[in-house]
Amino acid sequence: MSIVSRSAVLFALLVALFVPAGASASPLFYYLDPRQIDLTALLPPPPDVSSAQERADEEQVAAAVMRRSPAQLYHAEEDSMRTVFFFSKSIGPGFDSARLPLTTRFFSHVRSDVEHLIDQAKTYWERPRPSGAHKARGSYPSGHAAFAAATAILLSQVMPSKRDAIFGQARMFAENRILLGVHYPSDVAAGWTAGTIAAYAMMHDRAFQHDFADVDAELHRASL
């Protein structure tokens, strides 16, 4: 079972704790009310520094970095931008920002909401990054994995025929963070769960529902 697949089991337990509310009450958020979701209560804490899980995390990162080829490293770095149009490989060449302004705007809001939600958890836990990773923000949970999960869930709602390809690409995007040596496996699993929770919460927001309907219509007009 992959890292992101295991996180789905955790989500099934967490979702019962989530109580949807109305529109966002924070100017930082478009579709989420941060009072709804406390990731520090919903996610397990990162592994203790002296634990067997921490050692396993470190070993998996070291092994991934050692085994990666120059081509794998190049593609992982090239594909690390958090944009919905990363999925053009799964959807097709017509899936680009120039043709899809409503989709561009909507998913930029989704990205912003997920980033702010993840930042709160990163600040709380302040887990150091893997050795050699030069990143200012904490390691846990992974913002890239959260973005990948949330975006894949939402995009597959309007493109169900491409669901398998979308999720396959999202998993690769998330797990590339380990290959790049900038996140631990537990960071990626927690990020995927956080993104799943965020997507579920957004679906209950009225502004989200209005904008998502516009995205659905735009993508259908584009015959994607």
Residue locations for each model-derived region?
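Interfacial helix-loop-helix junctions of multi-pass membrane proteins
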Residues: 172-210
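Hydrophobic alpha-helical bundle signature of multipass membrane enzymes
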Residues: 26-180, 193, 222
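Polar helix-capping/helix-linker motif
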Residues: 6, 51-52, 205-208
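Non-catalytic nucleic-acid-binding interfaces of large nucleic-acid enzymes and RNP effectors
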Residues: 12, 16
